[in-house]
Amino acid sequence: MNLEKLGRFAGLLEPMPCIGLAYIAAALEQHGCHVRAIDMFAERLDAEGVVDKVARFKPDLVGMTVLTPSAPVCSLLSQMIRVRCPEARIVWGGVHADVFASEIVASRDADYAVHQDGEVTVCELVDAIAAGESDLSGIDGLTWLADGIPETNPARAINQDLDGLPYPAWHLFPYHRYGLLPFADFAKPVLTMSGSRGCPYRCDYCSLIHTGGKVYRRRDPIKIVDEYEYLVDRFGVKQMGFIDPIYPLVKKDLEPFVNELISRGLDKKCQWLSETRADRLDTETCELMYAGGCRRVLMGIESGVDLLLGNVNKNITTAKVREGVANARAAGIQTVGLFMIGLPGETPEMTKETVEFAVDLDLDFAKFAITVPFPGSKLFEDRWQKDLFRDDWENYTTFNPDPDRLIYHPPGYDPAQLVKMQSWALRRFYMRPRQLRKQFVDLRTISPKMLLYGLYGMAI
């Protein structure tokens, strides 16, 4: 990602653990490969710095996780690596690579693109490269060049045995530099875990089906605790984040998970947070989560207008949101509301209604992101079919200070006004006396540095 494009919002970013790449690294190590991991953002490297590290390692295969805003940087890295390491092959994974696999290999940004779960696919690719094979048609879940023409092999069968995967190879990453919420981390080190893959919901703005898959799969709760304990003991983790879009989704898994955490004393050693839907937070669920050490939930609320929630197939109501937030607060869990402004059909008046809804909920934290139709989402597909999409990928960011670079705005909603509304939303929510007291007296989670960045981001 080009941080310069984020303008005044750049300082609000903090490196987060890349669990997908860590899973791939672990699978390759288990397969007998010598693996090196580089986190460009966490290590504060420019492109030349990354390529220098790659060249010193002399790799046979270079892999990158590619999100849409980082695609131009990854393309540049690929070009530079081909010059410095001409014998190395390049493989891309992630949402962007999944959606644009044929274009990526045709343009030579990468030699291969991996689709969805990549652990087995990459190991088979390594074996084929080592054996000097040119025909890769037998590797499911791979796009490659066959006689100069992009060829996408059949999809790989969904991996139902998530507990059979090795733990992510965090020892290869600068884990001590990671955060989860730059404005509100409890303690460090922090790492992430996955209790499931896939999602049964089909929100129009989400591209998850291109990484986690359409099929929802979950892990054994006891096995999850085993990994939790390993991360606490091995890396001294103080705050754990579940990267599942909804955790826990299956209520019957929560009680054994919590009981096992308590029996091992992990509820006292490490706090955890998860993202979920507000309508999954009944009283019993919240009380169990708190007992097990959960101290914060992130809820994808999106909007305070029921019409807009329906427009993006969220399948929830504002009444259910109120109920879930109240249950979490009653249990002692801090609440983070994730909102989107500029949804299809939205007007400035509706944006104000959403912000006032966030204020009325009395959330501990709130994030107001400008809607972006990310590749892989239905919002993007709709624009693709109407030939309205744009390929200036570096501008696919939810905090964009330049209205001329906004990827999307609802018809009739002036882009400049939408950008101003985002800054106003942050000021309206955070600059209230009650909220200021909460941050600095009750929660004490915002550092002076992040306060200054936040005020600058609000354009105060």
Short names for language-model regions:
Residues 1-13:
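Short glycine-rich His-centered loop
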Residues 16, 163, 168-338, 348, ...:
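Radical SAM [4Fe-4S] cluster-binding motif and immediate context
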Residues 20, 24-161, 370-376:
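Glycine-rich beta-alpha loop elements in corrinoid/cobalamin-binding modules
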Residues 30, 51, 60, 378-460:
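Radical SAM enzyme core and accessory elements
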Residues 41, 67, 96, 243-250, ...:
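Short, solvent-exposed turn/loop segments enriched in Gly/Ser/Thr/Pro and often Arg
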Residues 55, 105-106, 232-233, 290, ...:
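Non-catalytic positions within long, well-ordered alpha-helices that form the structural scaffold/packing
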Residues 101-106, 285, 345-360:
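Catalytic cores of alpha/beta
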